[in-house]
């Protein structure tokens, strides 16, 4: 059930490797994705990984939190990134999608995390129109983002 690697393999983030090998559609999301994009100061205690709703999360020994996202919006803002030290790739949501998910699931990760990520993204030159376009594709997202943008401007 484990992921087997050679003893002389280079150091890597083995939680990412395990998630990517267990499910080909695994996608880094929420706080883990915000941390990957340097949009939060929060250090995730586990890897947040999205899979399509209806898919069964694999059994792993790694510190992975599996989240089920709707199949119709699963690919919105989804790209891939290679896992350092390996030839493995894993899905990663764009900064706009990460912020939209943070507001959509603010009850799970906290409003402050979502707000701080939005502030940092805007400080770096993020365009509100691109964020609103992504938010319009996701349920329960557009209104809280519009309110936060109004307060921050």
Residue ranges of model-derived segments:
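Short beta-edge/loop segments at beta->alpha junctions of small alpha/beta modules
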Residues: 1-32, 54-55, 59-61, 152-153
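Residues in well-ordered beta-strands of folded domains
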Residues: 5, 20, 50, 67, ...
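Residue-level preference for alpha-helix termini and adjacent loops
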Residues: 3, 27, 48, 63, ...
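Exposed, interaction-prone assembly regions rather than primary DNA-binding/catalytic cores
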Residues: 35-79
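Short amphipathic alpha-helical segments and their helix-coil junctions
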Residues: 8-15, 74-86
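Hydrophobic alpha-helical interaction segments
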Residues: 79-153
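Hydrophobic alpha-helical segments and helix-packing faces
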Residues: 26, 40-42, 92
